[in-house]
Design a protein with these regions (language model features):
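Active-site bordering "gate/hinge" segments
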Residues: 1-176
Length: 176
């Protein structure tokens, strides 16, 4: 399995071999940890990861799209081939791929990622959920139970590369 940047670069290598000038690729990874609490007890813990790569090919004004959830060289080559074949099935349209701007700001300046959040584990999220439950009950004596309480931690990593020199990555995370 290739890393995200290797996978995107592999698509651009395949496009160069075929002589395509206008190709872009997006790779995205999402991780989440979700805790459900009911009546001061953990009822459910779910952890999930999703990964995907999308390819857009412009061939003589025709746009072809394809994707894969596997970052193996074979799966990426198959997705690229599908995008090329899908382009042949489309009517030509006016689409312009933009060249890379002179400067793309570093996404870290957006403040979307806090590495400390990725360290929160099941126990930390459970403690947070239970403290929220206690705080709500303490705030109003009429609250006798909370039928559903969920706490989750998620992180996202995105990468965009194009045959025109665009290279942009962004990382974000949250606790909700």
């Amino acid at each position: 399995m290739l890393k995200m940047k290797q996978a995107a670069e592999h698509v651009l290598m395949l496009s160069a071999e075929k002589g395509f000038k206008d190709v872009d690729v997006v790779v995205e990874r999402n991780d989440s940890l979700d805790i459900e609490i009911r009546d001061a007890k953990v009822e459910k813990v779910e952890q999930s990861t999703s990964l995907g790569l999308g390819v857009r090919v412009l061939d003589e004004g025709r746009t072809g799209l394809a994707s894969t959830e596997r970052l193996s060289q074979e799966s990426i080559a198959h997705a690229f081939q599908n995008a090329c074949e899908n382009a042949k099935l489309q009517d030509p349209t006016q689409v312009e791929m933009l060249d890379a701007p002179a400067e793309i700001p570093d996404s870290s300046s957006l403040g979307l990622y806090n590495p400390e959040l990725d360290q929160l584990n099941v126990d930390d999220l459970t403690e947070l959920g239970l403290s929220m439950e206690d705080a709500v009950k303490a705030a109003d004596v009429r609250v006798v139970s909370i039928p559903y309480l969920g706490v989750s931690r998620g992180s996202n990593e995105s990468l965009l590369l194009s045959s025109r020199g665009v290279s942009y990555s962004q990382q974000s995370n949250e606790v909700a």
